[in-house]
Amino acid sequence: MSGKASTEGSVTTEFLSDIIGKTVNVKLASGLLYSGRLESIDGFMNVALSSATEHYESNNNKLLNKFNSDVFLRGTQVMYISEQKI
């Protein structure tokens, strides 16, 4: 079993390092959805995005805010991170 957990951890770490610099979606526990360029992520899932937009996740994903500076998202609120396919 320990081999499986080790493999899963390395796959997750590899995914996270591969998406740095790419456009991602980050969903928070509050239902807010952020999209932007992933600048950094740490072991606590704290996320820094640039060129970010903030949406409330719904059928129409209504735009709430567009940020001209970096956005920092606290890892305890992050539900998931996914690479945005263009």
Swiss-Prot record:
InterPro entries named in the record: Lsm6/sSmF (IPR016487), LSM_dom_sf (IPR010920), Sm (IPR047575), Sm_dom_euk/arc (IPR001163)
Superkingdom: Eukaryota
Family indicated by similarity: Belongs to the snRNP Sm proteins family. SmF/LSm6 subfamily.
Gene3D superfamilies from the UniProt entry: 2.30.30.100
Molecular function as annotated in GO: RNA binding
PANTHER family membership: SMALL NUCLEAR RIBONUCLEOPROTEIN F SNRNP-F (PTHR11021), U6 SNRNA-ASSOCIATED SM-LIKE PROTEIN LSM6 (PTHR11021:SF1)
Keywords tagged on the record: Cytoplasm, mRNA processing, mRNA splicing, Nucleus, Ribonucleoprotein, RNA-binding, rRNA processing, Spliceosome, tRNA processing
Subcellular location: Cytoplasm; Nucleus, Nucleolus
A GO biological process held by the record: maturation of SSU-rRNA
GO cellular component, one term: nucleus
Domain called Sm: residue spans: 11-86
Protein name: LSM complex subunit LSM6
SUBUNIT field: Component of the heptameric LSM1-LSM7 complex that forms a seven-membered ring structure with a donut shape. The LSm subunits are arranged in the order LSM1, LSM2, LSM3, LSM6, LSM5, LSM7 and LSM4. Except for LSM1, where a C-terminal helix crosses the ring structure to form additional interactions with LSM3 and LSM6, each subunit interacts only with its two neighboring subunits. The LSM1-LSM7 complex interacts with PAT1; within the complex PAT1 has direct interactions with LSM2 and LSM3. The LSM1-LSM7 complex interacts with XRN1.
Function text: Component of LSm protein complexes, which are involved in RNA processing and may function in a chaperone-like manner. Component of the cytoplasmic LSM1-LSM7 complex which is involved in mRNA degradation by activating the decapping step. Together with PAT1, the LSM1-LSM7 complex binds to osmotic stress-activated mRNAs to attenuate the osmotic stress response, probably by limiting ribosome access to the mRNA and consequently translation. Component of the nuclear LSM2-LSM8 complex, which is involved in spliceosome assembly.
Phylogenetic lineage: Eukaryota, Fungi, Dikarya, Ascomycota, Saccharomycotina
